[in-house]
Amino acid sequence: MTKRFKALLFDAGGVLVLPDPTVLGPLLSYYGGDATLDAHRRAHYAGMAAKSLAGSGELFWDEYNRSYVRSIGVSDRNVEAAALALHTTRNAWLWRWPIPESRAALAAIAGSGLPIGVVSNASGQIAEVLSRSGVCQAGEGPHVSMRVVIDSHVVGVSKPDPRIFDHAMPFFDGIERHEIAYIGDSVTMDIGAARAAGLHPILLDPHDDHPDADFERVRSLLDLN
């Protein structure tokens, strides 16, 4: 698939890193939730699907929280309490658990020489988190090298505003926007913004939560190779 594009841009949360299940597992097991890694990996995408279905913007996570805790098996009578606990615990710095398949895929893509970068709605922390979690960094370093890591807090514009991508384009000089794919996990935030910016949107949809989508989907970043 990568041969179709001259560059790739990635969202960070839900694509490269997840809310840390080693923190959320014990937290939500108190309410009867399954604490396993697999359960929490699944729960994130269930939450994102519910968030997209509701058309919720970046600041609204109620549907995500409820769907997340239901996905890990919290009973109806405990959903609101568990969702509140998730809401008060999940913050920007908790999006730090590296997705193993994504790390492997990034290494392979970078090894092919394809230009890559990150464009993420974040809180000023994402470059440090991606580096500390062993995923990537902007420029040379111990992990996968990105041409740029764009943090919405730093540049002052966030998805779904397509202007966030304007800050990445100078790092991909000579490449037309339609030749760049953007991979995200949110229909409302990522797909719409990428389309509006003239990029080719791809949704990371590991559990086929969007079977009727009118956009391209992959189950894993490994499918990009």
Which stretches of residues belong to each language-model region?
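Asp-based, Mg2+/Mn2+-dependent phosphohydrolase catalytic module
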Residues: M1-F10, P98, R103-A110, L114-N225
